[in-house]
Amino acid sequence: MYPCPKSTSNHWNMGILSGSMVYTQVLTGTLLGLHYTPDIYSAYYSVIHIYREVYYGSLYRYVHSSVASPVFTTVCTHLSRGIFHGSYAYVYSVMWMGIAVFLVLMAIAYMGYVLPWGSMSYWGATVITNLLSSIPGVVPWVCGGFHVSSPTVSRYYIIHSTLPVLTTGSLVFHVLYLHRLSSSSNPGYGTNNRIHFYTWLVHKDTLALVSGLVVTITQVSYGVIMLAHPDNTLEVSVLYTPLHIVPEWYFLEFYSILKSIPGRSSGFLVMISYIYVLNTYGEACTPSGLAGCTVHTGKYYTWYLLSVSVLYSLWMGVQLPQGEYISYGRGYLMVSIWCRVGYINGF
């Protein structure tokens, strides 16, 4: 039987929650893709067709758009749990695969945000393609031309439909590595203090799945447009620009980084490095940095300071990139880098 730590808490339930939500997204996305038309003249009206004429089309659309937020909430909580308890020191390959899944999920979410072809979708695609112009030769391949057009939507649709296959494969490897190395336990409890996965943790995961299902049904039933942008309900018009082009809330942290760096290429590199540095935790940590936050007082407070800075970046991401907000964003970036370096070195 698969041995699991006896000291697991509810933080260990986020893995199965995020996995179940990802597969829910794959199922609803497949059903929606059967009726979607990847063309700039038909994409918006195909979404309206799904709403009004496809049986349970509005339900599929609402579930697919609403579950995206819980996916990133559970994935980020799952990732922060591994950092807090020092899992990168014991199951490094598992964490590396998890970071790969996180990056692929970000790409899928961005591609999916463009497909409804509302006003915010169009200008969001324009901003990101301009950002990718810092890499030579990428923009003509992504756009299929010199600007965002029908080939762009077709490419985004194909990539958005193909990447979930890569995600499911990465999740399989993630679980295989986990079963080979076993889950990490809270530091101080010992590695031999373990119990069988069945039946104790099966019941625990089942309770977590039922709780997540209740929360998801509540959001789909009562708060489906709570996190939506009103501008994205309007059809694309190149003559109309939203007052502020804002991505989904789970991208606001990275959007605040881009607005804080004046150079386009440098901002892109900082944003990529901001994510990739998570892969270096297992190798770059000093001996004192390998300990989890529960046994290291300095890392304990550093982790909470980093968490507060991330919440602050979400607020910064919705502000206009002007005046004092640029300075605030640079201050956040400095604090965040200091926290990450301090966490690696164990102070």
Q: Model-predicted segments: where are they?
A:
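Membrane-embedded and interfacial regions of multi-pass energy-transducing membrane proteins
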Residues: 1-347
